[in-house]
């Protein structure tokens, strides 16, 4: 169980006084308590909008979503918006969801298979687990007319174009949440999209609590006082 992953290290209980200074009042930051599942569910309980910064290829994060799905639903989460699906492919994705994990994995493979079969399998399982728990799962990404980058300069330009998608992501997530009258939403996408988010949440997106990860296996879940890229760090070990 993921709640046990970092149990060998005591959870850090950090005063949120200095960390909370200047933070948008709609973002509620509390010291993590318990293991990774409890920390994620607690963040969702305290906030109407949570951003999960993914590290593509790392298995811990989709495994955490899978284990947390039922508890997230019980905490009031109605909507999971994900980078892994184009918003325009919503109908086809929902059909794949209804057909189960293998269909979802096949649906995602062309765009995300480069991050490894094991990771793709865990992401597919996480999306299906959320769906089975009664959480509405939607895609928020947009097609880009650009080839995969090869040179360092191409990679820089590619990332700039990717980060410019935050406006489109937010519009899609807002639209889908409104369609199902969601009270609480989680947006799950690449951590780079949620950088410099300490004050108001991610750039060009609605204010919300941002979660990042420490997957060294040596840390503990904590309020992020080290940088401006998230509010809470969930500790675990990728395996």
Swiss-Prot record:
Gene3D superfamilies: 3.40.50.11550. InterPro entries: HopBA1 (IPR054303). Residues 1-31 are annotated as: Disordered. Changing residue 169 to A: Not translocated into the host plant cell and loses the ability to trigger host cell death. It is found in: Secreted; Host cell. Keywords: Secreted, Virulence. Residues 1-20 have a biased composition (Low complexity). GO terms for cellular component: extracellular region; host cell. Its main location: secreted. Changing residue 83 to A: Not translocated into the host plant cell and loses the ability to trigger host cell death. Virulence factor recognized by the A.thaliana disease resistance protein RBA1, which triggers plant cell death. HopBA1 enhances RBA1 self-association, which is necessary for ectopic autoactivation of host cell death. This is Type III effector protein HopBA1. It comes from Pseudomonas syringae pv. aptata. The lineage of its organism: Bacteria, Pseudomonadati, Pseudomonadota, Gammaproteobacteria, Pseudomonadales. The gene is hopBA1.
